[in-house]
């Protein structure tokens, strides 16, 4: 697989956690949290990040129930992924995000804003699947 830069998104209606990583190092790290309720502001900032980091692909967390079923938030995440693809022409992968926020809180050791760390957990899961046969 050629080297790719990836941005990951932990989508929420009021804030979006963002992480960055690449397929060469197979490491993900938190980047930032977008705090905005307006679609225009969210996509404006996302456009700036895409310009700055030039990712080849995006990874969006797909919220599922504990037994792996879709829920109302799943449709919102899918819509966001479709908008990323439509607005920016970016290839988008959906990744099961079950327990990513809980894992992020454990990593942080606090209940602080964990959205960017949750995005890094989601991206790391995706990167880890790339190394599996």
Swiss-Prot record:
GO BP term (any one): rRNA 5'-end processing
Keyword Nuclease: yes
Entry's localization field: Cytoplasm
InterPro entries: RNaseH-like_sf, YqgF, YqgF/RNaseH-like_dom, YqgF/RNaseH-like_dom_sf
Keywords in alphabetical order: Cytoplasm, Hydrolase, Nuclease, Ribosome biogenesis
Chief subcellular location: cytoplasm
Keyword Cytoplasm found: yes
A single Gene Ontology CC term: cytosol
EC number(s) given by UniProt: 3.1.-.-
Gene Ontology terms for molecular function: nuclease activity
Highest taxon listed in the record's lineage: Bacteria
Gene3D superfamilies named among the record's database cross-references: YqgF/RNase H-like domain
NCBIfam families per record: RNAse_H_YqgF
PANTHER family hit by this protein: POLYNUCLEOTIDYL TRANSFERASE, RIBONUCLEASE H-LIKE SUPERFAMILY PROTEIN (PTHR33317:SF4)
Protein family membership: Belongs to the YqgF nuclease family.
Purpose of the protein: Could be a nuclease involved in processing of the 5'-end of pre-16S rRNA.
Official protein name in the record: Putative pre-16S rRNA nuclease
Native organism taxonomy: Bacteria, Pseudomonadati, Pseudomonadota, Betaproteobacteria, Burkholderiales
């Amino acid at each position: 697989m050629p080297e790719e830069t990836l941005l990951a998104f932990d989508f929420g209606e009021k804030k979006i956690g963002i992480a960055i990583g690449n397929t060469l190092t197979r490491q993900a790290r938190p980047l930032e949290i977008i705090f905005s309720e307006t679609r225009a502001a969210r996509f404006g900032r996302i456009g700036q990040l895409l310009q700055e980091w030039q990712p080849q692909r995006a990874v969006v967390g797909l919220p599922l129930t504990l037994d792996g079923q879709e829920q109302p938030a799943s449709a919102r995440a899918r819509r966001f992924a479709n908008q990323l693809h439509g607005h920016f022409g970016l290839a988008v992968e959906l990744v099961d995000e079950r327990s990513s926020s809980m894992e992020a809180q454990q990593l942080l050791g606090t209940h602080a804003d964990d959205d960017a760390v949750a995005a890094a957990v989601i991206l790391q899961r995706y990167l880890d699947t790339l190394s599996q046969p």
